[in-house]
Amino acid sequence: MAAKPKPLDAEIEALELDARYGHLAAEAIVELAVNRFRDEGGIATVSSFGADSAVLLHMVASVDKSLPVLFLDTGQHFGETIEYRDQLASDLGLSNLVVVHPKSEMLSARDPGNDLHKSDSDLCCEIRKVEPMARAVEPYSAWFTGRKRHQAESRAQMPVFEAVGPRIRINPLARWTTADQAAYMRANDLRENPLVAYGYLSIGCFPCTQPVKPGEDQRSGRWAGLAKTECGIHLPGLEALTNAA
């Protein structure tokens, strides 16, 4: 039986990968990461099927349409997002969509009225996103995200390869701009989440998402009026859970 990867091993590997490959084009990063990790613990991609999701999914599909695509169904997504998820997966021929749900017992105990977001948005995200995310990535050695540095100040220094506990998180689009995103969407005739047309430039659960006002950053419509800027699936809370996995 192979030894379980240790967080320090992942930290060293992520630094080495970022130094060696972090400068490459996004498509090249996706291809080399799939080839590296597919048979070494496995690799998946996490997607919200939100405003910017189509680009990374198209790149993944170009390499391996059977790669697991992990979608966190919080139970509070816009109906448009669920419909878009199914349409885009069909467009791209993605054959391994994995839908992950919150634990029903946690919802019953902590959010029986489906209104926890009003009183404790952090706990709501922990139950509906962070804990399910930790379960979703547990079988894999690495996973892709579509995060970009320009999206928010909290992401400005984000590396392409980074360690999360004993696993590697890969952000192939880290250096991309909104112009890069738009050009790729046009060049490949990719379907867009219909909510984008209504000003939703970052799309999460419907109670905590609103259209972005002119001049604001893309994620300003998330948890508007709160200091909160991330749901937690990209923060240290996830690392603590994945370390325990």
Curated annotation (Swiss-Prot):
Cofactors that this protein relies on: [4Fe-4S] cluster
EC number: 1.8.4.10
Name of the protein: Adenosine 5'-phosphosulfate reductase
Keyword Chloroplast in annotation: no
Locations listed in the record: Cytoplasm
The gene coding this protein: cysH
Naturally occurring in which organism (per UniProt): Chelativorans sp. (strain BNC1)
GO biological process, one term: sulfate assimilation, phosphoadenylyl sulfate reduction by phosphoadenylyl-sulfate reductase (thioredoxin)
InterPro entries in UniProt: PAPS/APS_Rdtase, PAPS_reduct_dom, Rossmann-like_a/b/a_fold
